[in-house]
Structures are given as C-alpha cells and as structure tokens.
Amino acid sequence: VDLDDLLEKGERFYKLYHDSLNFVTPGNSNVDSIRMMVIVHYTTTWTAYGGGYDDVIGALWVNPATMKPVGQTIAHEFGHSFQYQVYCDDPNKEAGFRQGQSGTSQDGNSFWEMCAQHMAWQNIALFPEWNCDVPIYLANHHRGFMHEWLRYQAFYLMEYWRMKHGEDMLGRVWRESESHEDPITAYKRIAGLSQDQFNAEVWESACHDITWDYPLGGYLRRIVDRQSEADRQTWYTHKT
C-alpha cells in the first residue's frame, strides 16, 4: 500500500468535505479535538466502509485492494465518514438521515450513497478515469429521485443545488435536517421552496443533464464521446 498516496489524497478529501462542503461546523464538531481514523485491514476480502465509532467520530475501514491507487472508492467512503459525523455533532441527535427509506433504521437509505458519490465527484480531477457509472444513469434516469436502482448514480440534482445555492448547500441539508425527515422535504424547507418551485428546479436540473452542463461536465462528455455510436444508443435505451 502506498501510504503516502493515502495520506496525501485523504488530506485533500478531508479538507474539501470539512472546509468547502461544510459537513461539519468548525468550533462545534468533535473533529476539532478528535482525529478521524483510517483503519487498513490486511485481508484479501474487499473492504471499504465509511462510518464511525460510538456516535462520536467518523472513521474509515479499508483493505489494500481499494487503494491501488487511492481514488473514487476512498473519496466515496470518506464521504460516509463525514455523513456519519453530522449526527455525532448534533446535540439533539436529529440531523444526518440515520433512518432508512421506510422511515426506520432497518433498511438502506439511497441518499447516503448518492451524496457520497457526489462528494467523490468533486475530486474527479484526482481520478479522471472514473466513468461515474454514466451508462447506468443514462439507462435509468427516468426513474424517481432516490430510486434504489440509481443509488450510486443520481447525484446530478445535488450538483444543481451546489450551482444554485453554493458549495455548502449539501452540507446544510445534512446538518439542518430533522429526525426522520425526507431529504427532499429538508431541502425544500432549507431553500424555502414550495412544491411547484421544487418541481421547476427538477426540470431545470434535467435540462443541464442534456449536455452535462456542469462545472465538471467535461469529464462526463469525454466519457460519452469515447464510446461507439452503438454503445451510446444502448446507454440511452430504457429497459423498463
């Protein structure tokens, strides 16, 4: 394992999520006094989990195969560590979307995954070969937001939020969320939007998807342009 690569990129991920995306509030976070830990398990079993310890501090567990080189996987899982930290830092223990899709803690929550992908995407200059799962997104983008089939791919609406409201908007949605609140309900409340206004934003966001009209859209356009016409047609064909 190239530990220097892990430390260098890990520090960059940390700085982005801490200083720019504002998943924590300096001066009011446990990270002010406690270090997040990265635990490397020397096993051949694929291991890449972001979370934390005892609702106190975020952490990351990985094995060597996930770090050759350090890239999207570590950036994504480190995102989970910061998502975990949101609940740790909330004195009321309400923020951070700890509930699952059904409103309980017994099932998954795709918002965690799509947000971690969005956080990783902000670092794509460090791993430009990542294809962002564009084929899966193009074949399924007609599905609803937070659909389980798009839990790793549907992060472009959050990029629209970043463009419209600023780099820290996603962090605000996490930090200012309320217990068992739906992520979209939280966003509408924080942004002060009615349902009709939110619907208009979804339409505008979809318009950006047509040509990948985002600050990092050049990476996506290159992914599509490298493919054959037949492959592109397959990507754009909805199977259901």
Describe the role of every protein-language-model region.
Residues F13-V24, E77-F78, F82-V86, M119-F127, ...:
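Sec/Tat-exported extracytoplasmic proteins
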Residues D90-T104, N140-R143, H208, E229-T237:
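Surface-exposed intrinsically disordered loops and tails
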Residues H18-M36, D90-F97, T104-N109, P128-P135, ...:
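Surface-exposed patches in mature extracellular/periplasmic domains of secreted proteins
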Residues D2, L6-F13, V70-F78, F111-C115, ...:
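Stable alpha-helical elements in mature extracytoplasmic
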Residues A125-E176:
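Long, well-structured alpha-helical subdomains associated
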Residues H180-T240:
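Beta/coil-rich, acidic/histidine-enriched accessory regions frequently appended to metallopeptidases
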Residues D55-L138, Q153:
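Zinc-dependent metallopeptidase catalytic helix centered on the HExxH motif
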Residues V1-I57, W61-F78, F82-N92, Q195:
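Zn2+-dependent metallopeptidase catalytic core
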